[in-house]
């Protein structure tokens, strides 16, 4: 018998178990193995090993999926690194990185190579369709130009499938399964103004292209509207024309439809895979496998796509690299941006991190020379100007449901002038809280230490942390008062205020509640493109990367909230949020205006936003962090525990802390145990210990010791986790 180490999705120390098989199995092969009286999926990690246990106790592999291609050594190296760095069992890390189809106990069908269509010799001898049949003629010209996929042909003519079927019956079409040696992303459109870069864009793209074929990290810092996407696309075109693969990571699912439209216009004949959580499981698995087999040349996805196996990656792009969505906040707590840089080094290719407001970690690396800084200082359209930003002190103003008189006047003027406006606040629901004016009672979530949010249309109170829901009460449970008051300004309340103030305006609310379905974003883009919307009411998701050409006024209602946070990253996040949302104004050739309402107008964040000066803000913030050895000058790990009572969680962490005190490196500081800022979540109470050090190596040694002690926990009431490079306090 041959013995193998098999990765299994179980919370053991490393998740690797020993099984036997009559033959050596290639590492990366998917198998079925017995585990605790059931059959589970496993993946061969090592083969032909010497077992460290009694051979009589070793169980046999039950099924080998021989028709499936094993996952590559480079993919397994990525998961091994991820497991080590984030101190997470290898077996569980492997299965966190796989699509649903590869986690199931049945075989998956491997995707077939794409078909390519062209006119054969007989077809080329035919008379082309008359020019008056312009779409049919366009399809014929496309087939004349060489082998093309059906997706690309449908760009020329939506009826391509039917026409090609007809022409094939005439004996004019040839099909091949072979991948084209050269992809042509510029087909017939090189002179299109959208693809012509300005001087700054061309310089940035040229520098990226000089690094093709070797590892180099670039930080592409460009003001909003400077055309970072065009720089990405220009560099991507060079890689795709070589037949190599590109990985393009986005922070949010809702950015995907807009990007895909641009990809279809620019790279119509490039086989593309799209990977995000709202895709059907079967489609996502097939796209994953197409990428693994090298059939998909362009892979676009959210954070989990960083684990997509790519046999011939030539470029990795991380758009909006500062965005917190790239950090997974449960189970395998990885950061996709950081893993993308590691993958680029592993694959020997450039990685481009792009943002108008880079993370301070990336900016610091660019300033220190670890990353090459590329800057776009002008908007892509020569006529486009940066928006005028005004900071309004609302401390003594009377507000109408959150709106100052100045804000309402600007909205009215812009509507009458035919412009589009965005009213921005980072709060879903009708109002943040329901309040009893007689006794002061507020309605808290029974499962969390958070207030319930009033959703008027659904007639519900909801917790935005654990999703607990209950009907709106008729009276106060403490004093019986029936006159309950909604306090605060959520998107639903703002929407209703605007409808009453401007009844003729088309007001559309955009938040997670209103975009929960698959096609909601595509429908929104269609309505905006057709000038069917006058005012958008939005939350944070509207601040990210969207390009709405007609938008020329942004009103920010509640800019102060995050500044009261205990999180040291709060100013950085607020600055990025305000800069990003301000950048939505004045795209294309329309001058933009931004009005930010605040009760803290003297705060340095607002001065930096008004000046539109990221570099000054970053320098000041980095100087402050350096004084206290905070990231990026120091490194952090949060060790967390939760239990029915916070006292139990703290006792568990403090016991481990006491055990480890004499063993930890002196360079590692320990803070806590202390309750988390939101103590109660989903009927569990949480505490944490922060480990900090200026030595990443010493910190990881300390975390390894902590994990060894925590793994000895046998108290079923206690759950623990480790968060390396945490983004939340």
Curated annotation (Swiss-Prot):
Keywords: ATP-binding, DNA replication, DNA-binding, Helicase, Hydrolase, Isomerase, Metal-binding, Nucleotide-binding, Primosome, Zinc. InterPro entries: DEAD/DEAH_box_helicase_dom, Helicase_ATP-bd, Helicase_C-like, P-loop_NTPase, PriA, PriA_3primeBD, PriA_3primeBD_sf, PriA_C. The keyword Zinc-finger does not apply. Binds 2 zinc ions per subunit. A motif (DEAH box) lies at residues 319-322. Its EC number is 5.6.2.4. Zn(2+) 2 binds at residues 445, 448, 463, 466. GO terms for cellular component: primosome complex. Residues 209-376 form the Helicase ATP-binding domain. The keyword tRNA processing does not apply. Helicase and ATPase activities on forked DNA are stimulated by PriB; E.coli PriB does not stimulate this helicase. PriA:PriB complex-catalyzed duplex DNA winding is inhibited by CGS 15943 (CHEBI:131351). CGS 15943 decreases ATP hydrolysis and decreases PriA's affinity for DNA. Its cofactor is Zn(2+). It catalyses: Couples ATP hydrolysis with the unwinding of duplex DNA by translocating in the 3'-5' direction; ATP + H2O = ADP + phosphate + H(+). Interacts with PriB with high affinity in the absence of DNA. Component of the replication restart primosome. This is Replication restart protein PriA. The lineage of its organism: Bacteria, Pseudomonadati, Pseudomonadota, Betaproteobacteria, Neisseriales.
């Amino acid at each position: 018998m041959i013995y193998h180490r098999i990765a299994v999705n179980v919370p053991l120390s490393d998740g690797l178990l020993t099984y036997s098989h009559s033959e050596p199995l290639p590492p990366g092969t998917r198998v079925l193995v017995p585990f605790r009286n059931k059959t589970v999926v496993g993946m061969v990690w090592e083969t032909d090993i010497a077992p460290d246990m009694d051979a009589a106790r070793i169980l046999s592999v039950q099924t080998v999926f021989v028709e499936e291609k094993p996952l590559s050594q480079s993919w397994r190296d990525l998961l091994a690194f991820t497991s080590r760095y984030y101190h997470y069992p290898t077996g569980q890390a492997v299965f966190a990185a796989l699509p649903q189809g590869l986690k199931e106990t049945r075989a998956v069908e491997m995707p077939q190579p794409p078909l390519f269509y062209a006119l054969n010799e007989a077809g080329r001898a035919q008379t082309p369709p008359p020019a008056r049949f312009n779409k049919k003629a366009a399809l014929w010209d496309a087939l004349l130009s060489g082998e093309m996929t059906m997706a690309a042909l449908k760009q020329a003519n939506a009826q391509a499938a039917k026409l090609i079927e007809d022409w094939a019956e005439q004996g004019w079409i040839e099909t091949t399964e072979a991948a084209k040696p050269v992809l042509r992303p510029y087909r017939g459109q090189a002179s299109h103004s959208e693809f012509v870069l300005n001087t700054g864009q061309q310089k940035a793209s040229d520098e990226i292209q000089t690094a093709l074929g070797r590892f180099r990290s670039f930080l592409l810092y460009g003001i909003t509207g400077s055309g970072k996407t065009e720089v990405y696309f220009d560099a991507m075109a060079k890689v795709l024309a070589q037949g190599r693969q590109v990985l393009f990571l986005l922070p949010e699912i809702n950015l995907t439809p807009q990007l895909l439209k641009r990809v279809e216009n620019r790279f119509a004949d490039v086989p593309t895979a799209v990977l995000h959580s709202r895709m059907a499981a079967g489609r996502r698995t097939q796209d994953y496998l197409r990428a693994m087999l090298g059939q998909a040349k362009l892979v676009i996805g959210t954070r989990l796509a960083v684990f997509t196996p790519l046999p011939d990656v030539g470029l990795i792009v991380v758009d909006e690299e500062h965005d917190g969505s790239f950090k997974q906040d449960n189970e395998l707590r990885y950061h996709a941006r950081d893993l993308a840089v590691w993958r680029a080094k592993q694959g020997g290719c450039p990685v481009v991190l792009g943002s108008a407001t880079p993370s301070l970690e990336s900016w610091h690396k660019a300033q220190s020379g670890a990353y090459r800084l590329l800057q776009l200082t002008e908007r892509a359209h020569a006529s486009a100007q940066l928006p005028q930003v005004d900071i309004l002190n609302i401390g003594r103003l009377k507000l109408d449901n959150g709106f100052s008189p100045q804000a309402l006047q600007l909205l009215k003027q812009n509507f009458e002038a035919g412009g589009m406006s965005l009213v921005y606040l980072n709060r879903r629901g009708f109002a943040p809280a329901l309040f009893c004016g007689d006794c002061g009672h507020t309605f808290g979530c029974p499962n969390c230490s958070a207030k319930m949010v009033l959703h008027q249309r659904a007639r519900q109170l909801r917790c935005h942390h654990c999703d607990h829901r209950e009907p709106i009460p008729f009276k106060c449970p403490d004093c019986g008062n029936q006159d309950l008051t909604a306090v605060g300004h959520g998107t639903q309340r703002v929407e209703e205020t605007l409808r009453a103030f401007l009844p003729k305006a088309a007001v559309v609310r955009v938040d997670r509640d209103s975009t929960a379905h698959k096609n909601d974003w595509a429908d929104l883009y269609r309505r905006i493109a057709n000038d069917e919307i006058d005012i958008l009411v939005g939350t944070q998701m509207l601040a990210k990367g969207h390009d709405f050409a007609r938008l020329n006024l942004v009103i920010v209602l509640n800019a102060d909230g995050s500044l009261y946070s205990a999180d040291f990253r709060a100013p950085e996040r607020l600055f990025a949020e305000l800069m990003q949302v301000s950048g939505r104004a004045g795209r294309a050739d329309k001058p933009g205006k931004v009005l930010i309402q605040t009760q803290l107008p003297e705060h340095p964040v607002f001065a930096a936003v008004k000046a539109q000066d990221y570099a000054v803000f970053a320098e000041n913030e980095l100087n402050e962090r350096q004084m206290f050895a905070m990231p990026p000058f120091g490194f952090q790990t949060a060790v967390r525990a939760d239990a029915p009572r916070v006292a139990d969680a703290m006792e568990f962490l403090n016991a481990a802390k006491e055990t480890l005190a004499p063993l930890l490196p002196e360079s590692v500081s320990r803070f806590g145990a202390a309750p988390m800022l939101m103590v109660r979540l989903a009927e569990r109470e949480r505490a944490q210990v922060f480990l900090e050090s200026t030595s990443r190596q010493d910190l990881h040694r300390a975390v390894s010791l902590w994990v060894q002690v925590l793994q000895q926990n046998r108290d079923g009431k206690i759950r623990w986790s480790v968060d390396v490079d945490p983004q939340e306090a």
